[in-house]
């Protein structure tokens, strides 16, 4: 029996409690999750935009894809940095094929000059990681209220959604998992 395998790769220091919550949430969908904390992968300086003081998410992900050697259904990179794509002021995450990167900087309360809140930060990170995993597994944005696959244009949008897939999105993942088990 083959489970869908997810690899989480940290590119910067991420608190262990956050990693544990990510694993717990994804495992609840029957996904096998591995963690690579000391990946020797990094954010390429060539992808840093010095005028914006942000990483170009497409350049970062293209670079990481080019040097990967992992055999997983979904590979998620985490960076406690700020990212953007052309046409947007920022992105929380970006997915290309089965690779995704999540930028954590704007998920922190401190970014908005508010008091640090590790619990809220953890919830936001889990939601955005789950969202990007959904994209790597073929899900698109969902309009079902509260679904983790809702598009988030702001941290308030992240706060409105839950850390779980709606029934329809969960069913799609279950169907994919059953298909992979038959291979």
From Swiss-Prot:
- Residue sites binding Zn(2+) 2 per the record: 142, 147, 166
Which GO biological-process labels does this protein carry? Answer: proteolysis
Name the Gene3D superfamilies for this protein.
Collagenase (Catalytic Domain)
The reply to whether Protease figures as a keyword in the UniProt entry is yes
Active site per database record: 132
The record, for Pfam families, names: Peptidase_M54
**Keywords carried by this UniProt record:** Hydrolase, Metal-binding, Metalloprotease, Protease, Zinc
Co-factor remark: Binds 2 Zn(2+) ions per subunit. One is catalytic, whereas the other seems to have a structural role.
Binding-site list for Zn(2+) 1 = 131, 135, 141
| Superkingdom field | Archaea
Q: Which CDD domains match?
A: Peptidase_M54
Name any cofactors this protein relies on.
Answer: Zn(2+)
Q: What is its EC number?
A: 3.4.-.-
Which InterPro entries did the record assign?
A: MetalloPept_cat_dom_sf, Pept_M54_archaemetzincn, Pept_M54_archaemetzncn_arc/bac
Keyword Zinc on entry: yes
List where the protein spans the membrane: none
Q: Which GO terms describe its molecular function?
A: metallopeptidase activity; zinc ion binding
Looking up HAMAP family in the UniProt record yields: Archaemetzincin
| Quaternary structure note | Monomer.
Query: In UniProt terms, what function does this protein have?
Result: Probable zinc metalloprotease whose natural substrate is unknown.
| Protein family | Belongs to the peptidase M54 family.
> Per its record, how is this protein called by name?
Archaemetzincin
Q: Which organism is it from?
A: Saccharolobus solfataricus (strain ATCC 35092 / DSM 1617 / JCM 11322 / P2)
Gene that encodes the chain: amzA
